[in-house]
Swiss-Prot record:
Coiled coil: none
Family assignment from sequence similarity: Belongs to the prokaryotic/mitochondrial release factor family.
Main location: cytoplasm
Gene of this entry: prfB
Organism: Listeria monocytogenes serotype 4b (strain F2365)
GO CC terms, sorted: cytoplasm
UniProt-recorded name of the protein: Peptide chain release factor 2
PROSITE patterns per UniProt: RF_PROK_I (PS00745)
Protein purpose: Peptide chain release factor 2 directs the termination of translation in response to the peptide chain termination codons UGA and UAA.
Modified residues (N5-methylglutamine): 251
Amino acid sequence: MELAEIRNELEKTAQQIKDFRGSLDLDSMEVRIAELEDQMLDPNFWNDQQAAQKVINESNGYKETYQAFHALEEEQESMEISLELLKEEADEDLQEELEKDIKAYMATISEFELKLMLSDPYDKNNAILELHPGAGGTESQDWGSMLLRMYQRWSEKKGFKVEMLDYQAGDEAGIKSVTLLIKGHNAYGYLKAEKGVHRLVRISPFDSSGRRHTSFVSVDVMPELDDDIEIEVRTEDLKIDTYRATGAGGQHINTTDSAVRMTHIPSGIVVTCQSERSQLKNREQAMKMLKTKLYQKEQEEKERELAEIRGEQKEIGWGSQIRSYVFHPYSMVKDHRTNYETGNIQAVMDGDLDEFINAYLRSRIG
């Protein structure tokens, strides 16, 4: 690596450090750390152990980020000093050492950026992903099955395990709805980027006139919540139906009514589960999904209230169109939130989603 290349790399990393500093609000972080430390000094701090542990976890999280950022700043400064020394006098050993340090430093920056991108409370959790085709019958239902395959392929590439919790086949092709449980570290953190409406433009294989069609599928993503999340569900608020589980193609895969449809009457939320042969296990999974949806609804209502207080006209929920997949008259996939796009539509449909997901997550750091 020539000195000019080393200088260019250090200029790039310096800009990244500057961007991190701009997005982290270190002054507010220092104030919050001090507040939390004051709470920990209170003689009654351990009276509520659960609350105390939350304070400790929050404090540790802020401290870890704060210290990691300052370590990056110090390393940047140290390497810039080494570069100045090399400009004054050539030193092969020092230059070789600096090249190694820069490579290691860039990897550390990437790790730090990933931690910033996946720092929300439930990012580490498994994800529940639902696909719901919009109006348009067979065309949109087929688009749903294409997205199902895309997410299955993406999950395989990440080494995540996929469980089909519910599958409702389309009338002629595709799906009416699908619910997946995607298991893996940070599955929700990544897949929350996919929440929204996905739009397809193509020449329909179901239209004998060969006309161009536009189809929509909504993707909903929720974290699978731990059992320690307290959500009260009263028995009298539930309507539970059972039916025979069906697989792809509509065939019955069980001879007993093991599939469960659970309706929460006050909220109107409906969940279904047919992944297990046992009705009892399907009930347990359906209840878990229901609690997750009720928790999500509660959080979204809080966000709406905050948005109203701030005067924000921000739409909360899955109703907004986030990405377009155009097969005709040209090939392009474009994310409307980040403007990231690619012409390699086949790679995307084969599960190459990381660039779209990372672009979205990076946009949220600031």
